[in-house]
């Protein structure tokens, strides 16, 4: 996923294996459970710890710059953040910002699926830009940086696939629906 950095130590071109998200969207209809049974699925740990571990070790083995974990604040696109929003996100300690990690991660959890996100830092968000140290975000820069990292992403995924465990491994993701339905 293409993301913007909210922290100066997370640089353009770095990778982040995301482990949390903040939903700042106004999207509706982001559940598979619209009744008649009420279902509350926990997203306390929304990304798969097994896949995240495989992604992290693979990226490190390839010698690529990676950050272990990070919180992505998902905003309503298509506009980028204002400086005020970006400064707030940064002060909250969140790491990255994008427009697409939600609802995919929540929907995967509702299906008891393992889900991993490898984020590519394509730009610095408006708050860091306001500090004067970096250039403002542009669509051209985002596309250029993501395209430059596409080969690395393909290499990472190809290296991860044979490491993904079979159904005999008891991953916590498989139990996401245990006790979630209220009948």
Question: What are these language model-derived features?
Answer:
Residues 2-132, 140, 144-147, 156-162, ...:
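Glycine-rich phosphate- or other oxyanion-binding loops that anchor nucleotides, phosphorylated ligands
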């Amino acid at each position: 996923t293409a993301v913007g950095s909210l922290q100066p130590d997370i640089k353009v071109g770095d990778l982040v294996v995301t482990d949390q998200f903040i939903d700042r969207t106004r999207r509706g209809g982001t559940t598979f459970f619209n009744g008649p049974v009420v279902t509350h699925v926990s997203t306390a740990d929304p990304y798969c710890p097994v896949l995240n571990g495989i992604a992290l070790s693979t990226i490190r083995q390839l010698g690529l710059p990676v950050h272990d974990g990070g919180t992505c604040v998902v905003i309503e696109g298509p506009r980028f953040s204002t400086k005020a929003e970006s400064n707030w996100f940064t002060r909250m300690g969140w790491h990255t910002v994008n427009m697409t990690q939600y609802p995919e991660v929540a929907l995967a959890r509702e299906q008891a699926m393992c889900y991993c996100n490898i984020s590519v830092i394509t730009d610095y968000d408006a708050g860091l830009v306001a500090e004067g140290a970096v250039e403002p975000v542009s669509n051209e820069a985002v596309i250029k940086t993501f395209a430059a990292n596409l080969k690395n992403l393909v290499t990472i995924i190809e290296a991860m696939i044979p490491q993904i465990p079979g159904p005999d491994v008891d991953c916590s993701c498989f139990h996401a629906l245990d006790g979630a339905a209220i009948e």
